[in-house]
């Protein structure tokens, strides 16, 4: 779905390592596909070699029908077009509630109404990147702010009809959780779900070891094809999601502008932080918090993650001489 701000998604590239799978009776099966404007890969220990791709596709299609900004018939598209007859489904209500929670705990740094600013700066669908004028920014800020939106009797109510919602900053994490809960409901104990780089893992891999997940080094302009792994973590019963500013930026008059926009000012955050990896009990919060931290910056982002229970962060930032440096919260364990 979600090419517009994930752009919030494409730079979150994680690489699952040491989880090579094989099919067969009772063996590990790997399935993959395309949804939400990106790829997904899922590995699970089967009962009898069963292929679950059709069921997974069905879950993700239902998810897109709720929240895809590219599906003209989705609930999100109709709501953004000010169709007031729409009664939101469970997907929409839950992602809205999570977004409101993140909006409140972040001091409005996390905001799914920010897409007009993203488009204004040229980080959206058409990729016409430029530094807008202050007047242009001010005019757009008038209809940015999740506190201008409520759900009343199942319907979305906006204080300004120009407000649009897009949940790219946490929706893929939410879809990871939805698929993971489905695996749990069927009794699967060992699996790894990755959608657009957002990961939830449970149990062990085909080698009988805890799943190992790689975190990319934030090299400017790097792609998924030429990524370099910065660190590796073991993961089971938790999610790991990343965000960074090294794949979607432009330079104008010697100044680097990244796509991580502060919804309260309308400008990209100027900070030494290059990327962050967040571990949390669920992917919707890990995903949303990763984006939030990039907007808040290194110091404030570290403080936020450190204050949250069962939540850890790994931060990669630039030193004054341009080298990479790292810091992490106390509970974030990196493999040696």
Where are these regions (language model features)?
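Mature catalytic core of soluble alpha/beta enzymes
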Residues: 2-6, 19-336
């Amino acid at each position: 779905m979600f090419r517009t701000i994930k752009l919030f998604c494409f730079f979150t590239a994680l690489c699952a390592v040491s989880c090579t799978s094989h099919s067969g009776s009772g063996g590990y099966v790997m399935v993959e596909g395309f949804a939400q404007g990106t790829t997904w890969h899922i590995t699970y220990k089967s009962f009898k070699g069963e292929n679950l791709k059709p069921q997974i596709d069905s879950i993700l299609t239902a998810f897109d029908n709720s929240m895809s900004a590219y599906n003209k018939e989705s609930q999100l598209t109709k709501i953004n077009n000010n169709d007031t007859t729409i009664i939101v489904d469970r997907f929409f209500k839950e992602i809205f509630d999570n977004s409101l929670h993140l909006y409140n705990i972040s001091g409005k740094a996390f905001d799914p109404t920010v897409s007009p600013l993203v488009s204004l700066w040229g980080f959206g669908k058409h990729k016409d990147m430029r530094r807008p004028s202050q007047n242009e920014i001010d005019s757009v800020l008038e209809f940015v702010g999740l506190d201008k939106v409520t759900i009343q009797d199942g319907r979305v109510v906006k204080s300004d009809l120009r407000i649009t919602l897009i949940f790219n900053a946490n929706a893929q994490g939410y879809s990871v959780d939805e698929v993971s809960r489905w695996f749990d409901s069927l009794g699967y104990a060992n699996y790894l779900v990755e959608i657009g780089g957002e990961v939830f893992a449970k149990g062990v891999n085909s080698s009988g070891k805890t799943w190992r997940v790689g975190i990319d080094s934030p090299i400017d302009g790097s792609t998924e094809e030429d990524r370099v792994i910065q660190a590796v973590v073991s993961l089971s019963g938790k999610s790991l999601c990343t965000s960074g500013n090294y794949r979607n930026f432009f330079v104008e008059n010697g100044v680097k502008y990244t796509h991580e926009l502060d919804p309260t000012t309308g400008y990209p955050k100027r900070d030494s932080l290059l990327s962050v990896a967040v571990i949390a009990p669920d992917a919707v919060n890990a995903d949303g918090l990763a984006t939030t931290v990039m907007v808040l910056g290194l110091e404030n982002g570290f403080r936020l993650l450190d204050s949250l229970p069962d939540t850890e962060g790994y931060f990669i930032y630039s030193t004054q001489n341009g080298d990479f440096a790292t810091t992490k919260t106390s509970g974030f364990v990196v493999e040696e």
